Amino acid sequence: MATKAFHECLLDVYHGEMAGEAAFEGMLARAEDAQQRYIVGSLLQFETEGKAKLRPLLMRYDLSMRDDAESMSGAAAAAGQLNALLWVERFSALGDLVRRSYLPRYQELATLVSADEDPEAARIAAFMGAHERALVALSDNIVAGAPDPAAPVSALLSFPLPRPAR
């Protein structure tokens, strides 16, 4: 049986996905070319798919699937601050933010559920940790000038966006 701590962490992760979706939607408006639209659009798709993966658990545990206005407004404000930065600096700051504020909680989710007790919840919890690590890897790739910075995120998408021609 899932614990109260698991339920609370699950909601925090879901709210993190909402925040990410709001932030990347705001960042998409500042994309300067097809490559930037692909990267930010892939991040937006990633957060949307993350929310979809979490909803069956939220429903099973009778937890709210409603959008959290506080998370979304905070994310929109953060996106505005990030958008004021140049592209590489934007992703350097994003990577730092995710490492500090989101990744620990996403990784904690997998420690709060046992695969023996609830295999589906454990699988989704483990995926969400990988999900957030992929977001950090994308940010690091942009800072490093990698040729396909979105690869870690695209590899985990069920519905990846078409990559633009160079």
Language-model segments: what does each one mean?
Residues 2-166:
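Non-heme di-metal
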